[in-house]
């Protein structure tokens, strides 16, 4: 006696088309410390992060570029396992003595929150700024990082990371 195997339906619900572009434009990342670097936020009191939505410790950082081709550049912060996809903020990855109810958020040089989410039509996240490469082939991509309370924070360590790619227009 043979059992009949279920047949797969041949009809698809839809098609997803992926589009992209590879360019010959390039820059050299010349940030002190190289392409991988740390941003050290100040130690803040839990009282400054006592309510959901409170922010503290805004700290500037820059990605410095040299030897760029003419045009415009921006930073694409890669969504990944360190990102809260609901908020676009960075999750606290501290494993021991971790502060709770604290995430990190990025802001552009215009002080607008920069959620780390998938790219939109402009190929940079909302509020990310395109910077025109200078005549000397350099560009500075300026940002801020700050603590963000999701509820009353508890004391402890906060650490996270995000991968980034320089994008060209």
From Swiss-Prot:
Additional facts recorded: The smf-1 gene is present in clinically derived strains, including strains isolated from hospital environment, but not in strains of environmental origin.
Pfam family, one: FimA
Gene induction: Expression is temperature-dependent. Expression is maximal between 30-37 degrees Celsius. Not expressed at 18 degrees Celsius.
Primary residence: other
Protein name as annotated: Major fimbrial subunit SMF-1
Gene: smf-1
GO terms for biological process, alphabetical: cell adhesion involved in single-species biofilm formation
Protein's cellular compartments: Fimbrium
Similarity annotation: Belongs to the fimbrial protein family.
Coiled coil, from the record: none
InterPro entries, per database record: Adhesion_dom_fimbrial_sf (IPR036937), Adhesion_dom_sf (IPR008966), Bact_Fimbrial_Adh_Pro (IPR050263), FimA-like (IPR039458)
UniProtKB keywords: Cell adhesion, Fimbrium, Signal, Virulence
Segment forming the signal sequence: 1-11
Functional summary from the UniProt entry: Involved in adherence to eukaryotic epithelial cells and abiotic surfaces. Mediates agglutination of animal red blood cells.
Cellular component per GO, a single term: pilus
Organism: Stenotrophomonas maltophilia (strain K279a)
């Amino acid at each position: 006696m043979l059992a009949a195997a279920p047949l797969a339906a041949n009809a698809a619900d839809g098609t997803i088309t992926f589009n992209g572009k590879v360019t010959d434009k390039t820059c050299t990342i010349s940030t002190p410390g190289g392409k991988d670097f740390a941003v050290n936020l100040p130690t803040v009191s839990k009282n400054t992060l006592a309510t959901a939505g409170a922010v503290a410790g805004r700290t500037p950082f820059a990605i410095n570029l040299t030897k760029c081709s003419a045009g415009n550049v921006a930073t694409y912060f890669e969504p990944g396992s360190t990102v809260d996809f609901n908020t676009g903020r960075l999750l606290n990855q501290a494993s021991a003595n971790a502060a709770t109810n604290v995430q990190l958020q990025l802001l552009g040089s215009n002080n607008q929150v920069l959620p780390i989410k998938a790219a939109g039509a402009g190929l940079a996240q909302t509020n990310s700024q395109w910077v025109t490469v200078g005549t000397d082939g350099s560009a500075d991509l300026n940002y801020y990082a700050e603590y963000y309370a999701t509820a009353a924070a508890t004391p402890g360590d906060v650490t996270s990371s995000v991968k980034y790619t320089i994008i060209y227009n």
